[in-house]
């Protein structure tokens, strides 16, 4: 089912165009405009491989509901894929380019996990640190035994949003943290996995703030982005970068039996309405609201794929990364109703497909974005899009449709780079 758009012409009446016709024309324009800029913005890109991947992105925009897409990949520490297609803002006729920022929903969690592991390393923390040692209020209503390990593994028992929550709370960090601290656990601490869609970011981010003194947004910028030269990873977009942000569009609503109360998304999945607000774009939402370019996300994972170092800059010791990716649970998730391989903040690889690798880790997000590292292949990859659908369909999210855009793009990257899969 396609929306109709009116196209002005020289006659007295307007011609009605389908969404697909509009997007096809805009995508062709955007692709033509970007062809000459690929190698100038990413000098390490192999043009042959990049052209193959870009063609796949363009076909997704033309033949499916997808609107704007980016993918970037590092191999052996070098940027080898940096491709994009489609529109960042269809209404304004603004195409995607390599610098466009996308709201990547829960893909943000993987970057947040990296911040937490670096905080643990810098401050000599234990993953079994009781949260109440740094955040006493969190112990209310039977949560006094919750630990940092549980927070990273979605086992603090509070996946539900605070009482009275509305999307306006997303731009009020202190209010969200007070509300989460006052929650009563729905599941036994440390015994049941229940995906903390929003709460994961606030719980871990507040632990970091109380330990380190900086917000997690500041920590990400100062400890990861600046040392690695990443331009395109934000937990709250500054004023100067607002013009880079892609407009989010909602796809079909969540299934009728989906309990939106637990993940903080309104019934019917009006995600775009909330996350297209300037106040929300500029808020720190480390569980599900980071804004990234695929290039920035991939560079972060390239560092992890090389066990903590990139371009001679060491961010994390290899031992810390190995501790962070150690499997914590492969149990039934009470929210998503699938078995999920979870490390400390990262998802682990699938049983089949490109990520059937013993060392692959990363995270997916609603809408189908993803980022991951595969040290065995020395690969870091990021995929961004602005058409938001309920199911992630991600390469690191086993059980999703095999022909989801995320899997199609992953396969295209592997094929273009002639990587085994």
PLM feature segments, named:
Residues 59-72, 91-151, 188-198, 285:
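Short active-site loop at a secondary-structure junction
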Residues 18-27:
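N-terminal export leaders
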Residues 2, 44-87, 192, 209-231, ...:
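Catalytic loop of the DD-peptidase/beta-lactamase superfamily, centered on the K-T-G motif
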Residues 1-17, 30:
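N-terminal secretory signal peptides
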Residues 165-170, 178-182, 186-188, 193-195, ...:
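Recognition helices and adjacent regulatory flanks at domain boundaries
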Residues 98, 103-107, 119-163, 181-182, ...:
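Active-site helix/loop module of the DD-peptidase/beta-lactamase fold
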């Amino acid at each position: 089912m396609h929306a109709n758009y009116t196209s002005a012409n020289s006659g007295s009446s307007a011609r009605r165009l389908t969404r697909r016709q509009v997007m096809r024309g805009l995508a062709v324009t955007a692709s033509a405009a970007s062809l000459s800029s690929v190698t100038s913005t990413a000098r390490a890109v192999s043009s042959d491989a990049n052209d193959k991947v870009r063609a796949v992105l363009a076909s997704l925009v033309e033949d499916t509901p997808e609107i704007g897409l980016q993918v970037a990949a590092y191999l052996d520490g070098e940027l080898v894929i940096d491709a994009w297609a489609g529109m960042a803002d269809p209404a304004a006729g603004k195409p995607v380019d390599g610098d466009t920022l996308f709201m990547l929903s829960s893909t943000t969690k993987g970057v947040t996990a990296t911040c937490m592991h670096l905080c643990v390393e810098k401050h000599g923390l234990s993953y079994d640190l009781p949260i109440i040692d740094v955040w006493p209020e969190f112990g209310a209503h039977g949560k006094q035994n919750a630990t940092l390990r549980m927070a990273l593994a979605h086992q603090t028992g509070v996946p539900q949003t605070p009482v009275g929550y509305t999307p306006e709370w997303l731009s009020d960090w202190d209010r969200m943290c007070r509300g989460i601290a006052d929650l009563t656990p729905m599941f036994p601490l440390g015994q049941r996995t229940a995906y903390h869609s929003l709460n994961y970011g606030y719980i871990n981010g507040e632990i970091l703030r109380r330990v380190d003194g900086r917000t997690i947004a500041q920590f990400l910028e100062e400890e990861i982005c600046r040392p690695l030269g990443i331009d395109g990873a934000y937990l709250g977009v500054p004023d100067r970068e607002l013009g880079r942000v892609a407009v989010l569009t909602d796809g079909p609503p969540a299934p009728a039996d989906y309990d939106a109360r637990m993940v903080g998304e309104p019934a019917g999945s009006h995600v775009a309405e909330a996350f297209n607000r300037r106040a929300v774009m500029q808020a720190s939402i480390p569980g599900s609201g980071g804004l990234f370019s695929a290039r920035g996300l991939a560079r972060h994972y390239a560092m992890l794929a090389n066990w903590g170092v990139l371009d001679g800059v060491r961010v994390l010791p290899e031992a810390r990364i190995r501790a962070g990716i150690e499997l914590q649970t492969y149990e039934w998730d009470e929210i998503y109703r699938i078995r999920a391989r979870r490390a400390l903040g990262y998802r682990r690889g699938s049983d089949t497909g490109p990520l059937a690798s013993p060392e692959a880790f990363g995270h997916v997000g609603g809408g189908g974005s993803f980022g991951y590292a595969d040290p065995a292949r020395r690969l870091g990859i990021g995929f961004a899009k602005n058409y938001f659908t309920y199911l992630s369909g991600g390469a690191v999210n086993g059980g999703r449709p095999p022909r989801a855009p995320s899997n199609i793009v992953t396969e295209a990257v592997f094929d273009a780079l002639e990587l085994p899969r």
